[in-house]
């Protein structure tokens, strides 16, 4: 007798090598609890449509409850001979309750079953991810609020550009994460569509009522085409794309944390619990966590490319290729969840060094644009003002001082429009306060945005 439920068609058993190569139980068993959820809803629907009787349903519920306990306690024995999580659970159920377990699969295929399991699992992961994104946003908001008036150099091309508030810089990532959360919510809408009832590819001849199952499982919509329902994994690709963007944003922040922690910048310090030392260099304190986040972003992006490549040449409907969707999908969710959890804690352990930040502003002529704007407001065309300020910067650079440190008579040598009120715009703090408009870096605007975001996240 063959172990396979489909073995009646074949003249010889599957080879051991093929069993090992094709079995997915090693990784898809993490879907077990969601598989049981789907089966219980399917059984309830079969009972309400007259396919199962009350006794069958009671036996299935009892058996599944026992199996769920075995899974949670680690007592269940998974068999690669049974290929996957679905057949392992079905065999265990049949061993426990007999023929009622064999009737459970009526009107269903593993094709729509696994698609349902993945969507149920992914829906829950997205809920966790959205909560973790908001937790990280809150940690960044705390930093932003504490540092609304902390001035630092803003960069373009990694060259000092203009003064910005450190709080404003943190708010930039709050905004990015906000869009990430919107993408996750939008993705969840398409994940939350039920394929169950599509059967293998063409539907079923049994009098099923998919609306019953969808309501029991909390699906907002039902997949309307059986071929599409079992064969596409665009929802998994979409999730991985959204996850990739979160990781890209965290990778960018990680790069900045790494730079800012280095002695050449000295803008911040990261708590010791997120760093490691060197086996040979006693003085080292390495920012391993942000470095690893930067590295893991490539891992998630790689999963996105892998899933797209997996789907690109498959004809309808289901193909065994789709077994390869789970490991990258699982790892993407795991990596993102772990990263978000550690990142929020790490940002709460960041120590800001305002004096070093301000000193860096003073070394890069960060208020040059403010001087140009000052001249424009006095009536000089902007292009002329740009040239005048460039000459002043060159002079200050040669003298080894900041623009704000040039004497008034020297500044007036570049333009007679310059008066003693110029120093009000040449200080970093003056530059910040001058940009007091929606989206600007002024401390007042930073506090406004912090308040707005706290209300949105409440």
UniProtKB/Swiss-Prot annotation:
PANTHER family on file: ARGININOSUCCINATE LYASE
Family matches, as NCBIfam families: argH
UniProt subcellular location: Cytoplasm
Pathway(s): Amino-acid biosynthesis; L-arginine biosynthesis; L-arginine from L-ornithine and carbamoyl phosphate: step 3/3
Record Gene3D superfamilies: Fumarase/aspartase (C-terminal domain), Fumarase/aspartase (Central domain), Fumarase/aspartase (N-terminal domain)
Highest taxon, organism lineage: Bacteria
GO molecular function terms noted in the UniProt entry: argininosuccinate lyase activity
A family per Pfam: Lyase_1
InterPro entries: Arg_succ_lyase_C, Argininosuccinate_lyase, Fumarase/histidase_N, Fumarate_lyase_CS, Fumarate_lyase_fam, Fumarate_lyase_N, L-Aspartase-like
Protein name: Argininosuccinate lyase
């Amino acid at each position: 007798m063959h172990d396979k439920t489909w073995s009646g068609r074949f003249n010889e058993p599957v080879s051991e090598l093929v069993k090992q190569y094709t079995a997915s139980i090693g990784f898809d068993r993490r879907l077990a609890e969601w598989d049981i959820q789907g089966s219980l809803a399917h059984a309830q629907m079969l009972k309400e449509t007259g396919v199962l009787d009350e006794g069958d349903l009671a036996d299935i519920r009892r058996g599944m409850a026992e199996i769920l306990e075995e899974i949670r306690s680690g007592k269940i024995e998974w068999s690669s001979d049974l290929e996957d999580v679905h057949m392992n659970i079905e065999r265990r159920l049949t061993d426990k309750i007999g023929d009622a377990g064999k009737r459970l699969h009526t009107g269903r295929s593993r094709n729509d079953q696994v698609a349902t399991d993945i969507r149920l699992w992914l829906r829950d992961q997205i809920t966790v991810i959205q909560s973790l994104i908001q937790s990280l946003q809150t940690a960044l908001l705390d930093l932003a609020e504490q540092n609304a008036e902390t001035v630092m150099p803003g960069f373009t091309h990694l060259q000092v550009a203009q003064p910005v508030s450190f709080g404003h810089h943190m708010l930039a990532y709050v905004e990015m994460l906000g869009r990430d959360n919107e993408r996750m919510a939008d993705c969840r809408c398409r994940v939350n569509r039920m394929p169950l009832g599509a059967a293998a590819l063409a539907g079923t001849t049994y009098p099923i009522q998919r609306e019953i199952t969808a309501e029991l499982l909390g699906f907002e919509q039902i997949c309307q085409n059986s071929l599409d329902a079992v064969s596409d994994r665009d929802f998994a690709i979409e999730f991985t794309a959204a996850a990739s963007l979160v990781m890209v944003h965290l990778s960018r922040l990680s790069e900045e944390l790494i730079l800012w922690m280095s002695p050449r910048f000295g803008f911040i310090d990261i708590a010791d619990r997120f760093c490691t030392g060197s086996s040979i260099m006693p003085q080292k304190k390495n920012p391993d966590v942000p470095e690893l986040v930067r590295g893991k972003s490539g891992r998630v992006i790689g999963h996105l490319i892998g899933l797209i490549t997996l789907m690109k040449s498959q004809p309808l409907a289901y193909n065994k290729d789709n077994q390869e969707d789970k490991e990258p999908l699982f790892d993407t969710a795991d990596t993102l969840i772990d990263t978000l959890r550690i990142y929020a804690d790490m940002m709460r352990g960041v120590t800001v060094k305002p004096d070093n930040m301000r000193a860096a502003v003073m070394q890069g002529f960060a208020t040059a644009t403010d001087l140009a704007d000052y001249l424009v407001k006095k009536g000089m065309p902007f292009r002329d003002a740009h040239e005048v300020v460039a000459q002043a910067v060159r002079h200050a650079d040669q003298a080894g001082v900041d623009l704000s440190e040039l004497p008034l008579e020297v500044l007036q040598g570049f333009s007679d429009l310059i008066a003693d009120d110029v120093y009000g715009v040449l200080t970093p703090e003056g530059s910040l306060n001058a940009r007091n408009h929606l989206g600007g870096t002024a401390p007042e605007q930073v506090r406004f945005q912090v308040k707005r975001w706290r209300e949105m996240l409440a």
